[in-house]
Amino acid sequence: MAGSTLGTLFKITTWGESHGKGVGVVIDGCPAGLSLCEADIQKFLDRRKPGQSRYATPRKEDDAVEILSGVFEGKTTGTPISLVVFNRNQQSKDYSEIASYYRPGHADYTFDQKYGFRDYRGGGRSSGRETIGRVAAGAVAVKILNELGITFMTYTKSIGPIAVSSGHFDFSEVTKNPLYMPDAEAAENAENYLDACMTELNSSGGIVECIIKGMPAGIGDPVFEKLNANLAKAVMSIGAVKGFEIGDGFDVAKATGKNNNDAFVLGEDGRIAKATNHAGGILGGMSDGSDIILRAAIKPTPSIAATQRTVNQSGEEISVNIKGRHDPIIVPRAVVVVESMAAITIVDALFSNMNARMDMLKKFYS
């Protein structure tokens, strides 16, 4: 199976299945000398861990990470970092009926068509548990970026029709509600909306927004290695993501040049800055020094208890009610996944940028 590796100089390879022995990641290209311990990674994994609210799957997993290689005496060694999380609470019997039919909205049918075989227990490689490896690698990437003064603000921007209000935005609220929304009023309304969805045996989607602060200008490459293109690839590779935006995104189609262009101005420090940020921090595929603002549209959880139509492997049309332990919404748990994929992409772009200019090479090797 190809397609499990991302990156060029900072490279990750995820592995494992939802109901296998474990899941994990191998990270290639992490510099030596970074302070790193399991607690650093665990903080990130705990943000996506199941069973933490009534809006997450009741599957109880500690998701405890173990560092198998690449770290010695609390520092990275420059060799591949291997991280593993063992699965502890599989209930594969919940999926025995699924072996005979294709779940609407899942990858069952496409896996079967490609490989002639599929792991029906929780979706195998297409399960949300695959993102554990991404988040573990993301924790390492964010630690590297924090050393360079680059930080993240990532949160749930909307759930169904309920969106965060700019007038009520308070990032400190994110950790105070189970939906990771920076707006207490919107979070309360979204909880009521989700409760209604659950009563109707239904699920909901939403939008995750990620703001990257402290980015220097000039990171990314023109043409086929644009920073926005690579961010889109990384975020769109998350199984539940169906849409991606940078800056004003699809709203630019309704704009004019006058109100879409960001005027350049001199900042208080005398450096070039922008008066607005419709571009979302990227121009010509390269960072412009402003905040990078991206959004990911997350689809509703496809496993719902309501009756759905499908076809079984005998070619018969049937009606199904999917059983098992499923999230009524995965948006809150996807927040850290989106952040992780963005961080991994940014680190790779920063490393690639080191050979862009002779003066940078001379400074490094002199």
Residue ranges, per PLM feature:
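Internal helix-turn-beta structural module
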Residues: 11, 303-366
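N-terminal, positively charged regions that mediate nucleic acid binding
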Residues: 1-59
